[in-house]
């Protein structure tokens, strides 16, 4: 009886809907998406180096910035034993400079400490063994925030290490930038103000930067683009379901009252997956 109840409970975690109901929900989600939503932002920038280059030029003020490589959801691979991070948009330019572009809607996700960790993680990732410290690449960690997390009503906040006595820059090559997504000044006609305005828009027709409007229109108003977005949303939904199932299995493992076979049956996971989860749980608690 216990096994049947567990399996029933796991199934009820996700409300069953028809395919057409899911599709209608997805269309509403797409309609309400803004570039300030990180799921949509990643699709906007995926495999679109020119758009990423344009946005980075506007934010950094580097007019001749030539992006040579751009990836979305970039995993830093050299943080073994440390907290892992996945960068929303990551790029490298012709001078070897590294750019991390992040969307942070929640204030708690846009702390100075988080920005510091991103900057440090990029340093670790791109300085190989035996290389000189002077070979560290120049890096830009950019947080576009939904709210004015710094509270000074500025459009952009630029941070570098400086001498606290006289303001002389350290020139270590690390830059941290917060872009205030809540900034709204009708008299500001700068490209950055236009960009921030567009990041809040749901409709392409309301946007001021053509390149961003065109890409938004593609994903929201063309059959091909909408299909891509629906597939991306479905993949995210499936991943969320899988993570919930893993969490149920981990809870059952922690209880210690069921066999691996019973847990696998209750969660529809394989015995191999249960064994891997147990190994991960043991590593965390060791």
Where are these regions (language model features)?
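Accessory alpha/beta interaction modules
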Residues: 1-175, 185-187, 286
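Short, charged alpha-helical interaction segments and adjacent helix-coil junctions
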Residues: 2-31, 92, 99-104, 190-286
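Short amphipathic alpha-helical signal-transduction/dimerization elements
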Residues: 119, 123, 146, 183, ...
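Compact structured core domains
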Residues: 174-198
């Amino acid at each position: 009886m216990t096994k049947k109840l567990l399996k029933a409970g796991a199934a009820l975690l996700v409300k069953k809907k028809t395919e057409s109901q899911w599709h209608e929900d997805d269309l509403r989600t797409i309609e309400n998406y803004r570039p300030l939503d990180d799921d949509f932002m990643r699709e906007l920038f995926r495999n679109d180096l020119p758009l990423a280059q344009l946005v980075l030029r506007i934010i950094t003020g580097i007019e001749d910035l030539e992006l040579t490589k751009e990836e979305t959801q970039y995993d830093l691979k050299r943080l073994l034993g440390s907290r892992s991070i996945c960068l929303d948009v990551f790029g490298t330019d012709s001078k070897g400079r590294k750019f991390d572009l992040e969307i942070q809607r929640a204030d708690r996700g846009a702390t100075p400490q988080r920005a510091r960790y991103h900057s440090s993680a990029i340093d670790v990732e791109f300085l190989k063994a035996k290389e000189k410290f002077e070979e560290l690449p120049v890096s830009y960690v950019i947080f576009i925030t939904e709210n004015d997390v710094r509270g000074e009503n500025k459009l952009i906040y630029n941070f570098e290490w400086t001498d606290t006595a006289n303001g002389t820059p350290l020139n270590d090559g690390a830059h941290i930038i917060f872009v205030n997504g809540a900034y709204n000044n009708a008299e500001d006609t700068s490209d950055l103000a236009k960009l921030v305005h567009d990041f809040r828009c749901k409709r392409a027709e309301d946007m001021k930067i053509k390149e961003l409007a065109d890409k938004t229109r593609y994903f929201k108003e063309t059959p091909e683009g909408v299909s891509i977005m629906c597939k991306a949303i479905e993949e995210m939904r499936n991943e969320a379901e899988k993570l919930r199932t893993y969490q149920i299995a981990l809870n059952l493992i922690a209880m210690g009252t069921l066999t691996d076979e019973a847990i696998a049956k209750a969660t529809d996971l394989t015995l191999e997956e249960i064994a891997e989860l147990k190994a991960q749980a043991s590593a965390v608690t060791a």
